[in-house]
Amino acid sequence: MVDLVARDVERDAAIRSVRFAAGTVIAGEAGVGKTSLAGSVADTLAERGVPVVRVLATAAGRAIPFAALGPLLPVDARDFQPALVPGMVMRSLAGLATRATPNGKPPVKPLLLVDDAQLLDDHSAAALLSVVHQHAARALVTVRLGGRPPDAVTALWKDGLLDRIDLQPLDLDEAGALLRSRLGGDVATVTTRALWDHSQGNALYLTELVRFRAGHRSALGGRWRVVVAGRHRGAAPSRRAAATPDRGRHPGRGRGARRAGAG
């Protein structure tokens, strides 16, 4: 189960889209949490009995026709004409729906999760578009901004076939919630703001900052604080800061007693 923090609104919106509409595209910059959000949505539907197929597009696979759709294709699929492959994909999805349904009940339409769809090869992208057009599966698609996705991928939202969620960087309060979850306790306001500033709200970078030389929790239950070396300010986020316990501040004393994200 994906551990998702501070994305409740977007998660609820994505679940509604895949349950009551054709599905959704989750778009955003690298590291903002697209994959985690999509994974959490897929896990939720799987717990409710929806069959889930997870597909990951890669830069290496982009040169190979239908590479990303391997989980839905027979091993000899590349021997067939490309025009026949989308039909194979849809038959495979229909088979999943039938196998997941108790006798006498309507088939449960599966969820097709496509991660990093901007890296799909053109053939796989066209097959995905056909699946959505034919309502053969619910679709949950992540797209990194700044790339050049295939036209068939951009058509998913430009033609109104799927909803689109633009995932923004975390705000200060959301960053505080993530830090409390990762560190397992309250975080000094100054620490939350420093890490949020350094990461610019990027969830992946923020998590890396926490992991980098995180130290140990204070035995007195002190809040966490951050030590930022000036020479690291221009470095990559994972090298800028080290999280250490705020031993000088205790719950109920001074400014450090304010809850993370409050200022």
Residue spans for each PLM region:
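Helix-loop-helix "sensor" segment of P-loop NTPases
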Residues: 78-79, 99, 140, 146-200, ...
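Conserved Walker B catalytic segment
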Residues: 110-142
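Short alpha-helical "packing" element that flanks the helix-turn-helix/winged-helix DNA-binding module
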Residues: 14, 256-262
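N-terminal pre-P-loop "Q-motif" helix
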Residues: 2-15, 85
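Conserved phosphate-binding/catalytic loops and adjacent sensor/switch elements of nucleotide-binding enzymes
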Residues: 32, 36-110, 119
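Pre-Walker A (Motif I) flank of P-loop NTPase domains
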Residues: 20-24
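P-loop (Walker A) phosphate-binding loop of NTP-binding proteins
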Residues: 29
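Helical "lid/switch" subdomain of P-loop NTPase nucleotide-binding domains
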Residues: 65, 85, 116, 120-124, ...
